[in-house]
């Protein structure tokens, strides 16, 4: 059986780095141990306690290989030119402009391309080849020359963002919709499925706060996005990121924020839900800043609410030691039970910061 390499450094390698970055890969690779039975290619040494912990939940002993033939698990890296095109924020920006979804989007390829911007409007400047949620900064009309030093760059109006959500589109056409939790710097902190058995926009917590006609327009836009990207030649799954924003007191949808042609944290959250959700419908994948507790202590702390196979209810500690974030999977019958579980988790770990609300 060929091993898998969790190449979470996918964008970095795709857009320039010639060598893999193990530290990035090791920050996420352990997630594969819970949802993929194949051996994991890794130079990291996992403790016997952690490997047994994974086995207790999956029923299979994880196999770690230091050297082996492998295939990439996060992003393909088999058709570099196509993958660069599909993952570039330039392609999504061009589609936003063409379809009139965000006319204040600007693709700046040199200092000669600086557009005339609205006075007082703040803009988000993105590296078109950066990792999702990274390599961005704020700019205004008056500081373009001093702020933007490298090109190309995508310039978009900074909107009053309220909630983030995505659709993951599988190769067979199936779409799953979920809410993403991000912090004030747009860094990913978790994914919530209110009903992973019916992962549609209608299940989003904020769905009914937005006009139905706006959702209809969004659905047409989503169909167009999928059509355009499929026509461009993609062969595997991809995510379409969107968000809700407030405009003069009215909630609206930014149809297309970006597209990620690779595995995503949202897809991982869905796969965890399928594996551990059972008859329960609400699930959440949660990241918190690494606590001062080691793995053993953290596992012991949350033992009163640890997930059990009999009921598929509770919390699973996913992360080992030596990682930047503690990661948890939460499974509950419904929102009421989920809120209670999260409350209990917070009380058991009072020093941890939980940005997720159910």
For each feature predicted by the language model, list its residue ranges:
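Phosphate-binding site of ATP-dependent enzymes
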Residues: 139-191, 243-256
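ATP-dependent carboxylate/phosphate-activation module, predominantly the ATP-grasp catalytic core
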Residues: 167-224, 260-286
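Conserved N-proximal alpha/beta basic substrate-recognition cap immediately N-terminal to
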Residues: 21-120, 130-131, 140
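Active-site nucleotide/adenylate-binding loops and adjacent lid/helix of ATP-dependent enzymes
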Residues: 84-161, 170-173, 196-221
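Active-site "cap" helix and flanking loop/linker of ATP-utilizing ligase/carboxylase catalytic domains
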Residues: 30-31, 37-41, 229, 262-304
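A long amphipathic alpha-helix within ATP-dependent nucleotide-binding catalytic cores
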Residues: 188-252, 288-311
């Amino acid at each position: 059986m060929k091993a898998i390499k969790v190449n979470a450094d996918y964008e970095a390698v795709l857009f320039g780095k010639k060598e893999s970055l193990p530290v990035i890969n090791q920050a996420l690779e352990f997630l594969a141990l819970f949802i993929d039975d194949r051996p994991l290619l890794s130079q990291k040494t996992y403790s016997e306690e952690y490997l047994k912990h994974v086995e207790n939940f999956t029923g299979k002993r994880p196999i770690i290989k230091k050297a082996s033939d492998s295939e990439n698990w996060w992003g393909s890296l088999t058709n570099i030119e196509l993958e660069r095109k599909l993952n570039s924020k330039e392609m999504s920006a061009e589609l936003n402009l063409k379809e009139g979804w965000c006319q204040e989007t600007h693709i700046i390829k040199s200092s000669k391309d600086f557009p005339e911007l609205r006075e007082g409007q703040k803009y988000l400047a993105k590296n078109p080849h950066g990792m999702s949620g990274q390599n961005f900064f704020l700019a205004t009309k008056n500081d373009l020359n001093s702020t933007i030093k490298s090109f190309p760059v995508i310039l978009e109006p900074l909107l009053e963002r309220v909630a983030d959500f995505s659709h993951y589109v599988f190769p067979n056409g199936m779409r799953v919709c979920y809410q993403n939790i991000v912090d004030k710097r747009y860094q990913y902190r978790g994914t919530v499925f209110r009903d992973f058995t019916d992962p549609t926009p209608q299940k989003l917590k904020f769905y009914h706060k937005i006009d139905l006609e706006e959702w209809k327009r969004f659905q047409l836009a989503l169909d167009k996005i999928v059509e355009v990207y499929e026509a461009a030649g993609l062969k595997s799954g991809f995510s379409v990121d969107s968000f809700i924003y407030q405009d003069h007191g009215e909630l609206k949808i930014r149809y297309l924020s970006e597209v990620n042609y690779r595995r995503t944290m949202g897809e991982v959250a869905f796969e965890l839900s399928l594996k551990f959700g059972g008859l329960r419908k609400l699930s959440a994948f949660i990241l918190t800043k690494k606590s001062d507790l080691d793995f053993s202590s953290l596992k012991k702390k949350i033992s009163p609410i640890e997930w059990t196979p009999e009921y598929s209810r509770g919390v699973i500690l996913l992360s080992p030691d030596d990682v930047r974030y503690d990661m948890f999977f939460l499974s509950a019958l419904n929102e009421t039970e989920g809120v209670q579980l999260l409350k209990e988790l917070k009380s058991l770990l009072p020093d941890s910061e939980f940005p997720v609300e159910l």
